[in-house]
């Protein structure tokens, strides 16, 4: 089909959970635009809400490190998962993450130019690794969180090595409570963040473009209901409030008990400790967010559908 390929149909199905023919039709209607096709499927109730880039594939590792009241997450990409399991690559990610703790802010270019523990710069070591391992690699991004008093708690979901894996989380808790109180709380919150994929700390932090996209989808659904315009407006506002509640960390329902808002979990922990605990910030890095991986082999049924 003009405008899209079998790979696009396959990717849309992965992104949306829609059936093959529904995915094909959506791509036809949107001229092959994947994001628009997802929105079209959702407006028709044929696709589940997908977290931003949650299914995009790329290889490599996310590293996390903490020193004092500062924590950092770093993503380093490779072409294959085989390299991600390589001891040399893992050592590079681990040491580069440690170097990132010395960088002010989230300047990945400054990280690349920084001194590497074994000599030269981070980029020099990366170039050497590419030559010896025989595969392209890239230091992609970094994110730092700090507290003036309290703890930053690191967590890696399904770690392949200490502090290395495909999902890395940092939780920044501001408080005068002891580490014995804060660290277990931070670990539970980090596990929640890894599972629940919040888009921002609170509703005010949600990306305006993301909200506008959800508003457009909600408006299309409301219009299809055939209800009066004033009712449609209430439906749209209700949908946006629900989206914000489900995607802002502080209003999300804690996955550990499936009933308590994260803000209330933190509040209760502070009361139990006889002090105030503030969830100041967090980082959630999932390997490959926003990176498209080239497809080289497609299911026969997808190819047949596109040709059909």
From Swiss-Prot:
Is Aminoacyl-tRNA synthetase one of the keywords UniProt gives this record? no
- Record's Gene Ontology CC terms? cytoplasm
PROSITE patterns reported for this sequence: EF_TS_1 (PS01126), EF_TS_2 (PS01127)
Where does the record place it?
A: Cytoplasm
- Residue segments, region Involved in Mg(2+) ion dislocation from EF-Tu: 80-83
Q: Which InterPro entries match?
A: EF-Ts_dimer_sf, Transl_elong_EFTs/EF1B, Transl_elong_EFTs/EF1B_dimer, Transl_elong_Ts_CS, UBA-like_sf
SUPFAM superfamilies reported in the protein's UniProt record: Elongation factor Ts (EF-Ts), dimerisation domain (SSF54713), UBA-like (SSF46934)
Keywords, comma-separated and alphabetical: Cytoplasm, Elongation factor, Protein biosynthesis
Top-level taxon in the UniProt lineage: Bacteria
Molecular function as annotated in GO: translation elongation factor activity
**Chief site of localization:** cytoplasm
Q: Tell me which NCBIfam families the record gives.
A: tsf
What function does this protein fulfil?
Answer: Associates with the EF-Tu.GDP complex and induces the exchange of GDP to GTP. It remains bound to the aminoacyl-tRNA.EF-Tu.GTP complex up to the GTP hydrolysis stage on the ribosome.
For this chain, the family text in UniProt reads: Belongs to the EF-Ts family.
Q: What is this protein called?
A: Elongation factor Ts
Q: Which organism is it from?
A: Erythrobacter litoralis (strain HTCC2594)
Q: What gene name is given for the protein in this entry? A: tsf
């Amino acid at each position: 089909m003009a405008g899209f390929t079998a790979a696009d149909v396959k990717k849309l199905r992965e992104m949306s959970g829609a059936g093959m023919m529904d995915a094909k039709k959506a791509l036809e209607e949107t001229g092959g635009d994947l994001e628009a096709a997802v929105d079209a499927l959702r407006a028709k109730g044929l696709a589940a809400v997908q977290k931003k880039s949650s299914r995009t594939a790329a290889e490599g590792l996310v590293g996390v490190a903490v020193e004092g009241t500062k924590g950092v997450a770093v993503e380093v990409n490779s072409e294959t998962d085989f390299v991600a399991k390589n001891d040399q690559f893992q050592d590079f990610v681990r040491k580069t993450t440690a170097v990132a703790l010395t960088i002010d802010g989230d300047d990945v270019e400054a990280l690349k130019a920084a001194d590497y523990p074994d000599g030269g710069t981070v980029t020099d070591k990366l170039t050497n690794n590419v030559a010896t391992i025989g595969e392209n690699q890239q230091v992609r991004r970094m994110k730092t969180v700090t507290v003036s008093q309290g703890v930053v708690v690191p967590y890696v979901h399904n770690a392949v090595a200490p502090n290395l894996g495909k999902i890395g989380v940092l939780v920044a808790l501001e408080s005068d409570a002891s580490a014995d109180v804060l660290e277990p709380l931070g670990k539970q919150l980090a596990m929640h963040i890894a599972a629940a994929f919040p888009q921002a700390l609170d509703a005010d932090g949600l990306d305006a473009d993301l909200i506008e996209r959800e508003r457009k989808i909600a408006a299309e659904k409301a219009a299809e209901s055939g209800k009066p315009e004033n009712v449609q407006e209430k439906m749209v506002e209700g949908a946006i409030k629900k989206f914000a509640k489900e995607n802002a960390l502080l209003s999300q329902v804690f996955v550990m008990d499936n009933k308590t808002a994260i803000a209330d979990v933190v509040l209760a922990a502070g009361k139990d400790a006889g002090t105030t605990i503030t969830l100041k910030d967090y980082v959630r890095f999932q390997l490959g967010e926003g990176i498209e991986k080239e497809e080289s082999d497609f299911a026969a049924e997808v190819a047949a559908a596109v040709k059909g």
